[in-house]
């Protein structure tokens, strides 16, 4: 359908938040939508909630599949989508009522392939951390896209995509981290023009049980592979590739800082992360110098990672002694 928006919601054991999410979608001022709920094998009451809403509103289409992961759920949603535009909303998040209307209007007026907005962070205790919105629209040719800048966007939620630009792109089902970041990178690579709308229309819940939080495990290691692929996506876009490699080095430094005390973050993993960090460190330095910054902290971590890990371990011992 010409201007229909297909809203894809991957679902897995989110009964606590699902009503709020679906209600916010159905309350959209822009009514030409279909809501594709893909239940990825939930064991809680998510299935019952989805069926109840589907009975109330014929714009909802509910699909159930055995547990295969969020990437498979999103891929199923894309396959089932009938709209000309696609938006992804996580089942534990919710959107403001003008989310679809405002993004679609900008995308059409500016002839964009992708438009994304700001988010409001909703903490686990219910506290809402708002951003000051200018409601200004920024647009640029996709080849000028950069990571590591204030207006960047690296995930699929909070964005509206022209379907013809992304329908043949698949979420990587072998990744458990940054699979949406890789997908967004591939969408940018396919796009002609993208835009950023400085308005907080998407409410993102920060939950302790989120896959990007907690202790290190082998699934989190797939973040390294995701960023390898992202850098490869932009192989022939010099500026974007440079900024992606700079971000990759930062990601490696972050993993060392956050997980070096975890048992699963063993020597093999540490050495691989350090290898990737050192490989991309020149890009981090070059990119920051281009922007008038000197990344001293990242340089120290990247050049002397084993000393930094030793420091973190000693610091942990001191803190335990002091308790």
Q: Where is each model-derived feature located?
A:
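Membrane-interface aromatic/basic loop that binds lipid-linked glycans or pyrophosphate carriers
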Residues: 261-323
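Donor-binding/catalytic cores of nucleotide-activated saccharide
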Residues: 70, 91-195, 202-219
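Cell-envelope/extracellular polymer assembly enzymes that use nucleotide-activated donors
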Residues: 3-6, 24, 34, 182
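Catalytic core of nucleotide-sugar-dependent glycosyltransferases
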Residues: 200-207, 213-242, 254-284
């Amino acid at each position: 359908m010409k201007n229909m928006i297909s809203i894809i919601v991957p679902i897995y054991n989110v009964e606590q938040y699902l009503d709020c999410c679906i209600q916010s979608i159905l309350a959209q001022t822009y009514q030409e939508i279909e809501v594709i709920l893909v239940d990825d094998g939930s064991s809680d009451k998510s299935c019952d909630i989805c069926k109840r809403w589907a009975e109330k509103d014929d714009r909802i289409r509910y699909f159930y599949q055995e547990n295969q992961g969020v990437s498979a759920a999103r891929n199923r949603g894309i396959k089932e989508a009938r709209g000309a535009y696609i938006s992804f909303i996580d089942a534990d998040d919710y959107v403001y009522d003008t989310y679809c209307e405002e993004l679609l209007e900008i995308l059409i007026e500016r002839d964009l392939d992708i438009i994304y907005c700001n988010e409001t962070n909703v903490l686990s205790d219910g506290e809402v951390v708002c951003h000051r919105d200018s409601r200004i629209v920024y647009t640029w040719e996709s080849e000028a896209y950069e990571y590591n800048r204030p207006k960047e966007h690296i995930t699929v939620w909070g964005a509206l995509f022209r379907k013809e630009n992304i329908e043949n792109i698949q979420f990587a089902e072998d990744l458990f981290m940054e699979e949406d970041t890789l997908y967004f990178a591939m969408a940018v690579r396919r796009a002609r023009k993208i835009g950023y709308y400085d308005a907080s229309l998407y409410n993102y819940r920060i939950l302790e049980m989120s896959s990007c939080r907690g202790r290190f495990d082998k699934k989190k290691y797939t973040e390294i592979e995701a960023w390898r692929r992202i850098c490869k996506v932009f192989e022939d876009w010099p500026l974007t590739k440079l900024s992606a490699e700079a971000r990759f080095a930062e990601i490696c430094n972050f993993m060392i800082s956050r997980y070096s005390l975890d048992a699963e973050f063993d020597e093999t993993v540490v050495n691989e992360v350090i290898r990737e960090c050192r490989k991309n460190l020149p890009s981090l330095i070059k990119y920051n110098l281009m922007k008038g910054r000197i990344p001293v902290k990242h340089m120290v971590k990247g050049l002397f990672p084993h000393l930094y890990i030793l420091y973190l371990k000693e610091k942990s011992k001191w803190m335990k002694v002091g308790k």
